[in-house]
């Protein structure tokens, strides 16, 4: 059976798990070997705490907006079923893993690391393949000429889609030693529709 790659991103209320910050949006996108999105799990979350104003300026999610969203404990079973046994790729993976482990611990769930096959960090991979230059998701999209026209704010869903393309570009670079051709971020009709609609605190399944 082919290895299943899932591209994950979270948005949070701040930067410190130990300081009480929580996950307020989570997305996991399954993509093929060319980075094209196949299906996705996405939801906003009620973090049950106030939003840091700096974090809000980055992702645009306010405390009041998230009040009607599900709590992590309400979606953890669906989330774990989606990621089970897969290889997870995240940009600065330690950050996302720590926050997700924190949410699972609060909800009495199992370990995230123990629920998946392995966790890969695209930032670390980029550092090994591209020793010079910036390695943020934005910088890598620019370097690989990946279109980001659907990205106005940081958002877990669009960032996960873009990460799939970045990972495919890094793989092509590693295998062939050449830069891949420019691409426009691939979005399924369902994902494109979700991104065009006003942000809504609603559980979204794609595919």
What are these language model-derived features?
Residues 1-117, 127-130, 135-154:
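Conserved non-catalytic scaffold segment of RNase H-like nuclease domains
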Residues 87-90, 94, 99, 103-104, ...:
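Acidic, Mg2+-coordinating catalytic module of metal-dependent nucleases/exonucleases
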Residues 205-207:
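Charged interaction scaffolds used for protein-protein
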């Amino acid at each position: 059976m082919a290895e299943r790659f899932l591209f994950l991103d979270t948005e949070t209320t701040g930067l410190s798990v130990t300081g009480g910050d929580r996950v307020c949006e989570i997305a996991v996108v399954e993509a093929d070997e060319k980075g094209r999105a196949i299906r996705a799990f996405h939801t906003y979350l009620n973090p049950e705490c106030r939003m840091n104003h700096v974090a809000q300026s980055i992702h645009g999610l306010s405390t009041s907006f998230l009040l009607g969203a599900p709590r992590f404990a309400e979606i953890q079973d669906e989330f774990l079923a989606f990621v089970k046994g897969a290889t997870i790729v995240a940009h600065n993976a330690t950050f996302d893993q720590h926050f997700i482990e924190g949410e699972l611990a609060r909800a009495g769930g199992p370990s995230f690391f123990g629920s998946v096959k392995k966790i890969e960090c695209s930032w670390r991979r980029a550092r090994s393949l591209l020793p010079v230059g910036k390695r943020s998701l934005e910088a890598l999209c620019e370097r690989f000429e990946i279109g980001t026209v659907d990205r106005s704010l940081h958002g877990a869903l669009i960032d996960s889609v873009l990460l799939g393309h970045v990972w495919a570009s890094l793989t092509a670079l590693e295998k062939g030693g050449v830069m891949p051709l420019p691409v426009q971020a691939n979005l399924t009709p369902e994902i494109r529709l979700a991104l065009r609609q006003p942000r809504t605190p609603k559980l979204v399944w794609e595919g």
